A protein has these predicted regions:
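Active-site metal-coordination/substrate-binding segment of hydrolases
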Residues: 68-165, 170
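A non-catalytic alpha/beta surface segment that caps or lines the substrate-entry region
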Residues: 23-70, 74-76, 80, 90-95
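Flexible, glycine/charged-enriched surface loops at secondary-structure junctions
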Residues: 20, 49, 160-165, 248-263, ...
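Short, low-order "capping/linker" segments at domain edges
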Residues: 321-339, 365
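Short glycine-rich, acidic/polar surface loops and turns
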Residues: 261-267, 352-370
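N-terminal capping segment at the start of a domain
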Residues: 2-29, 129-130, 222, 319, ...
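His/Asp/Glu-rich mid-to-C-terminal helical/loop segments that flank catalytic regions of hydrolases
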Residues: 233-252, 286-298, 338, 343, ...
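Midchain, well-structured core segments that form catalytic/ion-binding scaffolds
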Residues: 120, 126-139, 173-296, 300, ...
Length: 411
């Protein structure tokens, strides 16, 4: 196995699941365990100025090998895994020379199949890493960490490769939208950066959703069912009414590309009280604002129907479409496209991110930061997998991008 695979498997063994129901950063202390390991590894391979903050951010510098008046470039990946599916203990499976058929996931009844995921046929003859059906794999985004780490090691061991100063960073809590809450942009010291947090080999992204979180509190009134007529107010049924008043087909399972949605992530309740958690997403700022306005209209309607205060909400913007901040710096995509071409991808696939990245918020904080592929697929669930050859190519991509930046003139 190559080093990038060894590194990934090691990182995947750490339980780093974030938690969306806390108000601290990082949301889970266990993320510190991987952060400490990464800090030590960076130091061991010779990265300079390595540090770990008390908020679980790991930073480091790869010194320049040439004197050039070029921008400082950064590469970032996140340590946490999604709270939407179990991630511990992770037991990866390696499938060598994939034959194009079904892959049984461990001792479970689950099968990773091209009948469900036709693009698996693209990987015939290559080597895949899957989960075992009990947990997610964690390629999102421990593959990105492994690729950045091996890039750093390779460049330090090959000082003959010309490049400017390179910054690396690993962040917590990206999966819950708080990945850069306490990220030190000024201290990081990069002029531009890339997150390595994407999907299939040959893809890159610079458009994200505009995003908001929505928490809905429905207050009912419980009365014995035998004497409930004209008295009971069932919060569960009102909550269902709320959800039914949102567009039925503006949901994740019915949308793709630039189509936005409302997503009911979870719901808990009884007659007296019900709580629903949503995310709201759209690439268009105008439609995004219209979605939030619709929520307020539904709340007003239900409160008029059932009594003021029956439905209360907390709605907060999470991040915005980073395209606005990337468009003035499209040379970032041009450089990546040149690197892809040298690696056999004449036209990289550029699609909108149907989610967010740390780069979305960093771009609005003055660090333009598009997203690069890792080689993974089917994130946040048991069918997650990654191609080993894609990981190896991504390392080559990062090295080439780093080299190309030496020829960019710093403004």
């Amino acid at each position: 196995m190559s080093k990038v695979v060894d590194y990934f498997l090691k990182y995947a063994s750490y339980d780093t699941q974030s938690a969306g129901d806390t108000k601290i950063n990082p949301s889970t202390d266990k993320q510190f365990e991987l952060a400490k390991y990464l800090k030590n590894q960076l130091e061991e391979i010779g990265v300079q100025d390595v540090s770990m903050s008390d908020r679980c951010y790991v930073y480091g510098t790869i010194p320049a090998t040439v004197e050039a008046d070029c921008p400082t470039i950064g590469f970032l990946a996140h340590m946490d895994t999604s709270p939407d599916y179990p991630d511990d203990p992770t037991n990866p499976q390696i499938i060598t020379n994939y034959d194009g058929g079904d892959i049984k996931l461990g001792d479970t009844e689950f099968v990773l199949s091209p009948s469900m995921f036709p693009f698996m046929k693209d990987y015939i003859g290559q080597d895949l890493i899957t989960a075992d059906g009990h947990t997610l794999l964690g390629a999102d985004d421990k593959a990105g960490i492994a690729e950045i780490m091996y890039m750093a090691e390779y460049l330090i061991n090959h000082p003959e490769i010309p490049h400017g100063t390179i910054k690396v960073a690993f962040t917590p809590d990206e999966e819950i939208g708080h990945g850069v809450d306490n990220f030190d942009v000024e201290g990081f010291g990069a002029d531009f950066a890339y997150t390595v947090d994407g999907g299939a080999w040959g893809s890159m992204e610079y458009e994200t959703f505009n995003a908001a979180s929505l928490r809905v509190f429905v207050h009912g009134q419980n009365i014995h069912p035998g004497s409930a007529k004209a008295k009971m107010k069932n919060s569960v049924q009102i909550a269902m009414e709320f959800d039914n008043m949102l567009p039925a087909f503006d949901r994740p399972q019915y949308t793709e590309m630039y189509e936005g949605f409302f997503h009911l992530n979870n719901m808990e309740g009884n007659v007296e009280n019900t709580v629903m958690n949503y995310i709201i997403r759209d690439h268009s700022m105008e439609i995004f604002e219209n979605r939030k306005a619709l929520v307020n209209q539904v709340v007003a309607f239900l409160n008029a129907k059932y009594g003021e205060g029956t439905v209360e909400i907390k709605m907060n913007d999470s991040y915005y479409n980073m395209a606005e901040k990337i468009l003035p710096h499209m040379f970032l995509l041009d450089i990546a496209a040149e690197a892809f071409k040298e690696l056999g991808i004449d036209t990289p696939v550029v699609t909108p991110v149907r989610g967010g990245t740390d780069g979305a918020r960093l771009s609005y904080r003055g660090l333009p930061c598009p997203n690069l592929c890792t080689g993974g697929h089917n994130y946040h669930g048991k069918y997650e997998f990654i191609c080993i050859q894609s990981m190896e190519k991504t390392v080559e991509l990062l090295i080439k991008i780093a080299q190309k930046f030496k020829d960019v003139k710093k403004n």
